[in-house]
Amino acid sequence: MSERKSTLVRPDSVRVWRGFRLPALTLDQFCSKLGTVFVPATVKMQIAAGLEAYIPSILAGLPGKVDSVPDETAILFWESQETYWNGFTRLAVRTYTLTHGGVYVTENQKSRADFPVLFAGALSFDQPVYLIDRPADWMCGVVSHVVGARPTSQDPATFCTEVAGALGRIQKKVALDGAIACIGSDYLVYWELAPSAPGSPHPPTGLPILQRVLDWNRVFMPAPTFLPIGLWDEWAGMDVQSGSSFNMQFKRRENS
């Protein structure tokens, strides 16, 4: 069907989002704003600007999660980095961007998104990396996601070294179609795309390698999710809860 037409996009065209909930919002209010406004608006207001894939996950309210771990994560693929930056010439994109302040802590870039660089063995805090240097389609593929906290027995520098070693092993030994990671001083976020060719019912994964260097962690399997509405339809919104994870499905713009 047209909504799942495969399009390969470069791994450096993804924005890696780590969002922290506004303290004034309760968990129910946070999830409500994500489900009624933010997640659907990301899709409906960004398709015409060149959005290629959008995979959000909700961590707020998960048992054991510490405040230094993001409350929401997402990867947003674009046709290219240039396409993303050109989007700000559009009123719809500028309007959508303003909605962040009603949901997330934006001061001092606590909540932020960044483009990745190719992983070459070392990590820097808040600089995402991609492990597989070839294009892939993350909307039509099977995605796994893990978010984890730094062990309390480690300082941030040691944590960074341990995670870099784990990512190096994944890059060298695990046959994936894509892998993206970002480390903060207190957390790691990581996504991987399973091989597209049919084969084993248990595709290769790097998740256990990373889980061994994490303290608290949670694995997500984003569910393919369609939005059967337009911007001007009457609609109550999505059901977003703590632990929700979506691989949003949509028809890309025609010239993508």
Locate each region found by the language model:
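Macromolecular interaction modules
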Residues: 1-256
